[in-house]
Swiss-Prot record:
<feature type="region of interest" description="Disordered">
    <location>
        <begin position="93"/>
        <end position="133"/>
    </location>
</feature>
<keyword id="KW-0687">Ribonucleoprotein</keyword>
<dbReference type="GO" id="GO:0003735">
    <property type="term" value="F:structural constituent of ribosome"/>
</dbReference>
<keyword id="KW-0699">rRNA-binding</keyword>
<keyword id="KW-0689">Ribosomal protein</keyword>
<dbReference type="InterPro" id="IPR020814">
    <property type="entry name" value="Ribosomal_S6_plastid/chlpt"/>
</dbReference>
<keyword id="KW-0694">RNA-binding</keyword>
<dbReference type="Pfam" id="PF01250">
    <property type="entry name" value="Ribosomal_S6"/>
</dbReference>
<comment type="function">
    <text>Binds together with bS18 to 16S ribosomal RNA.</text>
</comment>
<dbReference type="GO" id="GO:0006412">
    <property type="term" value="P:translation"/>
</dbReference>
<dbReference type="InterPro" id="IPR000529">
    <property type="entry name" value="Ribosomal_bS6"/>
</dbReference>
<dbReference type="InterPro" id="IPR035980">
    <property type="entry name" value="Ribosomal_bS6_sf"/>
</dbReference>
<feature type="compositionally biased region" description="Basic and acidic residues">
    <location>
        <begin position="103"/>
        <end position="133"/>
    </location>
</feature>
<dbReference type="GO" id="GO:0070181">
    <property type="term" value="F:small ribosomal subunit rRNA binding"/>
</dbReference>
<comment type="similarity">
    <text>Belongs to the bacterial ribosomal protein bS6 family.</text>
</comment>
<dbReference type="GO" id="GO:0022627">
    <property type="term" value="C:cytosolic small ribosomal subunit"/>
</dbReference>
<dbReference type="InterPro" id="IPR014717">
    <property type="entry name" value="Transl_elong_EF1B/ribsomal_bS6"/>
</dbReference>
């Protein structure tokens, strides 16, 4: 069996169907002793460019070990499902189990101006204009 990384994008209006789709697709991959190593639901995200006049899509990532027949069946299921906007199946050398960069926590960066309340900034601005006059 080979290792695969699978990403698919679902129409945003059909986001409530995603858990059922994930269950159906993981069942296909687990046929003949396949195994899912990583499953991440990235949720609705902004698209880099519009697809079918849509600007958002629901993303799902699966890393699995499966047979070629199971992957062919999965690709066939993607092809005939109108809710799937795009999909990508890549073969990888090893199983990937650590969280993807999309799922890792990012510290929120604050703008430098936002650290001071607006009123204090306004007071400082009036003080500097008075000093210059």
């Amino acid at each position: 069996m080979r290792h695969y990384e699978i990403v698919f994008m679902v129409h945003p209006d059909q986001s409530e169907q995603v858990p059922g789709m994930i269950e159906r697709y993981t069942t296909i991959l687990k046929q003949d002793g396949g195994q899912v190593h990583r499953l991440e639901d990235w949720g609705r995200r902004q698209l880099a460019y519009p697809i079918e006049k849509l600007h958002k899509a629901h993303y799902v990532l699966i890393n699995a070990e499966a047979t070629a027949e199971a992957v062919d069946e999965l690709e066939n299921a993607f092809r005939f499902n109108d809710v799937i906007l795009r999909n990508m199946v890549m073969r990888t050398k090893t199983a990937v189990t650590e969280p993807s960069p999309m799922m890792k926590e990012e510290p929120r960066r604050e703008r430098r101006d936002d650290s001071a309340p607006r009123q204090e900034r306004a007071e400082k601005k009036t003080e500097t204009t008075e000093d210059n006059a």
